[in-house]
Structures are given as C-alpha cells and as structure tokens.
Amino acid sequence: MRNIKSFLKPVITGLLVVVLLMLTFTDTTFAQTVAEKAEESWNLRQTEIEQLYQEGNLNGALDSAQQAVSLAETAFGSGSLKAISSLMLLAQIHTELDQLEEANQIYQLTLETSVASFGEAATETLLVLDNYGEFLNSIDAEMAEPVLQEALRLSLEDDPQRAFRMKSVAVNLQELGRIAEAEDMLSQALKAFKSVFGEKDSDTLEAMAKLAQLYYSQGKLKEAQVLFETALPLMQEVLEEGNFIILESKENLAEIYRHQGKYTQSETLFIQSLQGAVAAYGEEDPLVMQIKSHLAQLYEDTGKLKKALLFHQQVYEIDLVLLGEEHPNTASDLNNLASVHRRLGDYQKAEKLFRKSLNIMIKALGEESPQSVSVMNNLALLLENQGLYDEAEPLFKKAFAISGKIQGERHPTTLALLNNLAFLYESQGDFERSELNYKNVIQLNTEIFGETHINTLSNQNNLAYLFLRDNRFEEARPIFTKVHRLWSDQLGVDHQNTLKALNNLGRVQKSLGNLVEAEKNISAALTGRTRVFGKRHADTLRSMNDIGELYVVQ
C-alpha cells in the first residue's frame, strides 16, 4: 500500500507544519494565523488540482493531489475531513489514469480512516461508501454489491441521499442481471426522489428515464412508453433544450414507437432528437451515432431501404475515421450494412460484408463473444436465404453452442438462435424437427418472460405458420387468433407483426373454407399494410396476392 506521508511537501508548508506541531499556541492570534495559512495552502492546492485536471494534465493533478493529502494529514490530522476528501480525490485521479489497484487501496484506506474517525453510519463515511461503490461498479459489479448495499442499509429513512443510494443499488442489480430486483429498487428510488425533491427535479426525472429504460429492456413497452411520455413534458419544462436526458429520452421513446409500429411518431421523434443532438454535441457524438443507427432500422422496418443504407453508411464512415477498421463498432456497422444489402437481394455484397464484419469481431473480441455470435447468426440467415442449408446449419449450431456457453441456455440470444434453427429445419421441409425446436423455445420463453411476452408470442406465431405450411389449419387458427389479439394490444393494430398475424389468420380461414372471415381479415391486413408501408412493400404485395387467390376461390 502506498505511503502517502512519504511524498515531498512544499518547503513553506513543511515549515508551517513543524511550527504547528511544536508550539503550545500560547499566542492564540499566532496559532490562528498558522491554521489559516494551512487552510489557505490546502485550498490553493485544491484549485491547482482542479485546473490541472481541466487541462487534461492528469499526472500533474496526481502529484498535486498527493501533496494535498500529505498537507491535510499533517496540518489537520489523518482522520480529518480534509484528509479524507483529499484521499478520495487522489483515488479518483488514479481511476482516471486507469491505475485501478492504487485507487482501490486508497478507497479502502479512506473507508477505514473514516469509520475510525466518524463512525460507520456517519455522513462522512457514507459518502466514502458511495464513491467506493461507484468505483467498484465500474470495474466489477459483484465486488460493488456489498459496498453499495451497506451504504443503503446505514442510511436513515429521512436522509436525502437515500434515494441516490437506491438508484445506485438498482443500477448494480441491473449489471448483475437481477432485473426484477433492479426494477423494484428503482421504483422505490423514484418514489423517494419524488418525495424528497419533487416531480420536476432533474434527479427525479433522470430516475424516471432510467426506470423507463429498464422497462424497455424487458420488453415492457407499454410501461416504458407511459413513463417516457410522462417524463418528457416535465423535462422540457425544467431542463435546457439541448439537455442530454431530454435527447436520450426522445430517442428511447422513438425506439419504443418503432417497436410498436407507430412509425410516423417514431420518425418524428428520431429526427427531433437527431437535430438536437447534432446541434448540442456534433456529428461524431455517440448519441448522434445511436440515433442514426436506430433511424436506419426504422427505415428498414418500413421498407425504405435506400434511406436505411444512407444512414448506416454515415455511421460506418464516421466510425471508420474515429475508431479504425479493426474496431468492434466498425464491424457492427458493416453488419448493419450487410443486413440492408440482404434485404435488397444483393446477396453477394451482403455475404462479403458479413464475413468481413465477423473476421473483425473475432479478431477484436474473440469468437466466444456476444457480438461475434450476432454476426454469425446473420451470416447463417443470409446463407439460408440463398438455400445454402448445408452451410447455414453448422453456423447456426456453432452460434447457438457459443451463446449457450457464454450467456447461458436461457439467454434471449440463445433462445433466438434456437428459433432460427427451427426456421431452418422448416425451410428444409423437416417439419418434425422444426416443431420440436419451436415448442422447446416457446416453453423456455414462457418460463423466463411469461406467456404474453413479445418473444414468446413471436415463437408461437412461428409455430402457427409451420402448422399453416403443414396443412394443420385447425391447430394454426387458435394460435394466430391469440397472437393477433395480444399483439394488437401490445404493439398496436398497425404494427408489422400484428398485420402479419392477421393476414396469416385470413389464410388459415381460407384453407378451412371460412371465406367471409378470410376476406375480412386479409382485406384488413392489406389496408393496414398499404397505409403503413405503401403499395410496393413486400408485405403489401403478399396481402394483394392472398386476396387475389381468395377471389379466385370465391
């Protein structure tokens, strides 16, 4: 452990300290003068540290911080508040320099010192626990948990900082994958923020945004939507126009609208947040890049593939300049570009980009990484689209095995790959193996997320489509009916998935001879698809073909 007292002190400060230690201070005026000078020296050192830090001179700031610790310990006592705050600042600078072991040791010393000087439940000690917990959470969530939980446990019910500690614990639980506990804790934190600071306080609004994001990450789109729609007007009332939380919340709500099929509202919010983020932070800011990427996905969803390609290309070109060709973000951009080329039917271009993306991902992150698994999956889908089943199947199986190993057999990505394997078997005409896999993934998603979760419903829809292809119409009908009803409620009647389920329900009814119901549903799907996607979209053309076939039968 580093010996703070070994650092060289400025000569004047050293002389002052010697006088402080040796004199009995019979001259009160002189004693006050010496103490005032020590205080002035310490304050000047803090100003110097801040200036060096702002200039980006972290090594200079570190030297000054070490001197500030030495001065504070000698002049005011090793257990003084000034010494403790100097130690915490020193730890923070070590953290900025990525000297994590040194930072950890200093935080531990600071905590021990504060407990000895003020007690474990003192405000000063809780502040050290807060900072130490945040430091640990940035490097290891498991190590951080007991520290953050202890700070919360020791907090009094009427302590204004208790709400912040609840939020920190919630973030930590989310990092640990304990989502239900995180949601409960963040809900409590939000109530505490509202009670202590009011609904329009910036910290309250930030907690609302975090809870909404947590809902969204679980697929709870309605809960997330309501919270964002409640928070945004309040944010716009009390925060500055270009505030990051406002722009990020607009982007998040736009993404929710996209998933719900509210494409016009989604595009409007995406463009608003994009314009605001560019004005506030510039074209190369991470938030700007994220908005462009999601806006491109919106254009993919609505069949505006050239617009999608344009935005994905913009993101790729900026990442290429800022991060270089071998960076994972650049590889992700190539993956996105390849996905659009696949949709455009340019399979040769798409395959080239997917393989380049995969090579970069493996080189940068290793084969056993979630990012590499994602690109493997997309490449396998492309091979399947081309009927290259012998190449697609081993790649799907490899991605599935890796995902199960690194993320767990019940992780959403692993389950999505199992679903894709089922679809591959369906494409090959192996309906028996396909059905087995679909039912397996439905069971797992039901256990993990519930029967009405969007992932579970998507798998059920796929099983119903398999039954449709296998002429098992009586088995397909109740599933399509259920999925359409729940998707209408969850995603809205104009969502792509909802319209797909409605159209397929019409096809089943046609095959069962229920021609009136079939016409009603296929016509409704055609009207919705034309309104949302236009006349030339593949989904619209599918409905046109289905209604034409129905009229021939009639």
Model-derived regions, located:
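Conserved alpha-helical positions within TPR/SEL1-like repeat arrays
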Residues: 43-54, 81-96, 123-137, 160-175, ...
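Bacterial N-terminal signal peptides that target proteins for export
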Residues: 2-15
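TPR-repeat structural position
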Residues: 58, 100, 141-142, 179, ...
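Amphipathic alpha-helical segments of tetratricopeptide repeats
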Residues: 69-73, 111-116, 152-153, 190-195, ...
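Bacterial N-terminal signal peptides
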Residues: 13-24
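N-terminal leader/linker segments that initiate helical-solenoid repeat arrays
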Residues: 27-63, 70, 81, 85
